[in-house]
């Protein structure tokens, strides 16, 4: 689905306000507690530029969710925007002597890089409260369930940054022509904890192990070894014949040698290139770190007793990727039930018998985008602990007595008690007594019979 928004639609948006900021809902795919919530912040937009910001914010969300692998999981995301006005449009460019009065005090030229667009604390302004502190306050007040924060800076200069080291995913982009690519690349940092795969030296940068960057050249222990064919040499020569394979290519994290990346090229190395298999896998696992594959399950109570032999309905509601379905398998007492692969399952209690039992549903994502999931992120298990105490009644030992009386014995199990009923036509049944079993039986003696040539008897347990 393509979501577009123009200035004429601003008044139709869902909004919520707090002091300086107003929250707008851009995209809803489910409750915030069960979706990944992308929040776009306005930086360098004046009061009369609200419409422009909402358009830019919507484009930022759309651009992110139309890029692989996000597109396949776009139904897992919600989109929001927070508008806060700046006194002036744009952003600081200290090297050229340009300074703007903006709400988050954003600046280019950070840490010696003209395109490194940041907010405080940074090398130009170390005061947390004048940048990231404002972000945190707005999010706490307006969208505490945020998962990915995107700050759109109203400046045409090429620039951006991404940081997840603080525990709060923050992505910053300008509105440059390349902004769509900047957002996707920086999401690799902010959302997937991915490393830059650049090989050019960056003085002072200290490389660390990341999902897509390593110093380990051992095939057996390499973190992305599941993607590497046995025929691929390690390290992998950086020539065109190896462009399509996952291997071990020298150069990553601003290091020419000693550090390796998974593929010859990738979104984390150059714009307008797709994420490689290893980076895409990491992003999918990051998605499942924040949302579970199951939206809901019924019954909501997972510990209960079943007294009746009537079938009991169970169900799960899996999330829905764009082009494939999640798989479902039902288990009883740890054993897979043949053919039980739908989201709904009808349990026949009599097939299990009395006692303690477990019913389990396992919902998993069979995507080919992930080959290694040791933490089981792509799988959700719901377990119901069941105590079956089923009624199993019989009328036995009929014995005729004097004065048209007789005795019956009720045997079996009836945790909820039982009723003895009588009928002359199998249609209308009259209750004669309600009681409970003692030691697995109950002896019933009728009163004197009158006006019946014959009568039928049965015993049932109340539902």
Predicted regions and their residues:
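Sec/Tat signal peptide C-region and signal peptidase I cleavage site
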Residues: 15-19
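Bacterial N-terminal signal peptides
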Residues: 2-14
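Solvent-exposed segments in extracellular or luminal domains encompassing
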Residues: 343-356, 445
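Exposed beta-strand and adjacent loop surfaces of beta-rich binding modules
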Residues: 35, 311, 325-327, 405, ...
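Active-site-proximal segment of zinc-dependent metalloprotease catalytic domains
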Residues: 20-34, 41-46, 58, 62-203
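Short, composition-biased motifs enriched in small/polar/acidic residues
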Residues: 362, 382, 387-463
């Amino acid at each position: 689905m393509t979501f577009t928004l123009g200035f004429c639609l601003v008044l139709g948006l869902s909004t919520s306000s707090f002091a300086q900021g107003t929250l707008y809902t851009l995209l809803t795919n489910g409750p915030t507690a069960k979706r990944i919530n992308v929040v776009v912040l306005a930086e360098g937009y004046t009061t009369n530029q609200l419409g422009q910001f909402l358009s830019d914010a919507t484009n930022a969300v759309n651009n992110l969710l139309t890029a692989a692998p996000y597109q396949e999981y776009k139904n897992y995301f919600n989109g929001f925007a927070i508008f806060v006005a700046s006194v002036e449009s744009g952003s600081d460019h200290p090297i050229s002597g340009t300074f703007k009065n903006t709400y988050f005090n954003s600046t280019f030229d950070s840490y010696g890089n003209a395109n490194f667009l940041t907010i405080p604390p940074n090398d130009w302004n170390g005061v947390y409260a004048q940048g990231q502190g404002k972000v945190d306050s707005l999010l706490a007040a307006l969208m505490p369930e945020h998962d990915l924060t995107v700050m759109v800076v109203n400046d045409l200069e090429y620039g951006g940054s991404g940081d997840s080291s603080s525990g709060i995913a923050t992505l910053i982009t300008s509105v440059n022509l390349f902004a769509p690519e900047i957002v996707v690349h920086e999401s690799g940092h902010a959302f997937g904890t991915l490393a830059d795969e650049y090989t050019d030296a960056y003085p002072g940068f200290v490389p660390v192990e990341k999902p897509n960057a390593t110093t380990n050249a051992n095939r057996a222990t390499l973190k992305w070894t599941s993607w590497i064919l046995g025929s691929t040499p390690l390290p992998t020569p950086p020539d065109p014949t190896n462009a399509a394979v996952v291997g071990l290519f020298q150069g990553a994290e601003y290091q020419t040698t000693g550090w390796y990346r998974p593929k010859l090229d990738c979104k984390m190395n150059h714009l307008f290139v797709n994420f490689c298999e290893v980076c895409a896998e990491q992003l999918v696992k990051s998605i499942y770190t924040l949302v579970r594959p199951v939206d809901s399950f019924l019954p909501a109570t997972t510990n209960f007793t079943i007294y009746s032999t009537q079938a009991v309905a169970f169900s799960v509601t899996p999330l829905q990727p764009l082009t494939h379905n999640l798989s479902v398998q039902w288990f009883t007492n740890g054993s897979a039930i043949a053919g039980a692969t739908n989201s709904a399952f009808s349990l026949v209690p009599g097939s299990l018998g009395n006692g303690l039992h477990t019913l389990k549903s396992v919902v998993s994502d069979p995507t080919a985008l992930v080959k290694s999931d040791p933490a089981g992120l792509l799988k959700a298990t719901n377990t119901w602990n069941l105590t079956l105490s089923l009624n199993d009644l019989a009328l036995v030992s009929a014995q005729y007595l004097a004065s048209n009386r007789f005795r019956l014995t009720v045997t079996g199990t009836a945790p909820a008690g039982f009723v003895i009923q009588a009928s002359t036509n199998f249609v209308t049944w009259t209750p004669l007594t309600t009681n409970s079993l003692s030691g697995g039986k109950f002896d019933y003696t009728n009163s004197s019979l009158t006006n019946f040539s014959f009568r039928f008897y049965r015993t049932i347990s109340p539902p």
